Structures are given as structure tokens and as C-alpha cells.
């Protein structure tokens, strides 16, 4: 078995990294052509590492050393003599990512594209070529199912269970007055839907919105800009559980506190 490891630099990750290397002692560490890509860290590190990493047919394995673990299947206690056997029993599959096409470049997104504006700068939204909204507010989020427990949840979006392959748009603090009323609710769209955000050049460049793909800022010029958004299949394969019980347990341990 050939493998590659990406590990966060947090203190709690280092002992887990050494333990993983020991477990993989009989395997071959390579830079290219690997069968498995091991990602050690929390969900934030996983997202920043994996979405745009183009490894065809490699299997991505998340090992949690952080707080959230929606993308990780293992933790330190799983790194025992039976780890490789557990790995062979895992089910890997391709998942939907959000493809953001702008200015001739494509960016892949695991959680969300976030659009921010501190001046309620207008954004035209089109769904499958049809004008949907002339939006003004503090920002917009759009992302695949996997992002529904991230920033989307904080913005009062829907938490979407595994097995439902959809696209979600969320308005953040929409500007409302008699002549400007938007839907004010999360929108859940079928996976084949194509969305466009259209932004006109600002007279004052400082008013132009800012765009972030999974927290990475897109350096876009102040100009007429169209972002084409759709779901695409990942080239790597992921071991993200589709079991309802697993997802419920993660939601309860992360977000729900009851006495």
C-alpha cells in the first residue's frame, strides 16, 4: 500500500502522527501515485487540505485530532494493530463538491462559498438561467450538503442529512424595506441546478464584495463579475458515513446539550 500524510501543526497532532507512521511501517510513503491520503487534524484542516487536491481514485482518510469530526472517520484510539484491517473494511465513495467558476478559473469547495459585503452591495442571483433575486444584505452562502454543519448552520441554514445530494443558498441579514423583500429562508436546490451570482463593478472599489471558498479569499478585481456555481463529483474518494445514526451521534455530541 502506498500512502501520503497531511498533518496539522497543532501540538495534539504530533503524537497521533507518530503513531500512524508506526502503524503504517510496512507500507510505502510516496509523494505521488498513492492509494491513501491520510489527513490528520480537525474539520477545518481537512477542508483546507482536501477539496482542491486532485488525486484521481485515491482514498482520503480523515483522522480527527481537533474538536469537530464530521469529515473524519478515525481518531487516535483507532490506530492499533488492527487499523489496516479496519481500513480495508471502509466504504469509500465520491462526493459532491461545489465548483466555483470565475474569470476562467475553477475552485472546488467542500463547505461553502461565502460572499460578504459591508455596504449591502447588490448581487443578482440566477437559478438555471432564471432571475431569482436582486439581493442586498451582508452576504450570501452557497454550498453542498457536506457544508450544512459548518458556516451554513451558524447562518441559520438547514442541517442536511447524508443521502440527500443538494445545493443550499442562504441569505445573511437581507436588507428589507417596502421595495426590497427577499425570500429570507434557506433555499434547497436539486443537485443538477446551476446558479449564478452576478455582481457589477463598484464605483468605489472598497464597496465591492469579498468572496471566500472554504475560508480562502478569492482575489477578484473590481469589475463586472459572474460566478457560475454547480455541483460536481470529487476525483478522490471519501469515507464519510451515510448512516443516519452516525450523523445523529455527531450532531448530538457537537451541537446539542441537554440536562
Curated annotation (Swiss-Prot):
GO terms for molecular function: ATP binding; metal ion binding; NAD binding; NAD+ kinase activity. Signal peptide: none annotated. Gene3D superfamilies: Probable inorganic polyphosphate/atp-NAD kinase, domain 1 (3.40.50.10330), Probable inorganic polyphosphate/atp-NAD kinase, domain 2 (2.60.200.30). Keywords: ATP-binding, Cytoplasm, Kinase, NAD, NADP, Nucleotide-binding, Transferase. InterPro entries: ATP-NAD_kinase_N (IPR017438), ATP-NAD_kinase_PpnK-typ_C (IPR017437), NAD/diacylglycerol_kinase_sf (IPR016064), NADK (IPR002504). NAD(+) binds at residues 43-44, 111-112, 136. It catalyses: NAD(+) + ATP = ADP + NADP(+) + H(+). It comes from the Bacteria. GO terms for cellular component: cytoplasm. The active site is at residue 43. One of its GO terms (biological process) is NAD metabolic process. Its cofactor is a divalent metal cation. It is found in: Cytoplasm. Its EC number is 2.7.1.23. PANTHER family: NAD KINASE. Involved in the regulation of the intracellular balance of NAD and NADP, and is a key enzyme in the biosynthesis of NADP. Catalyzes specifically the phosphorylation on 2'-hydroxyl of the adenosine moiety of NAD to yield NADP. Belongs to the NAD kinase family. This is NAD kinase.
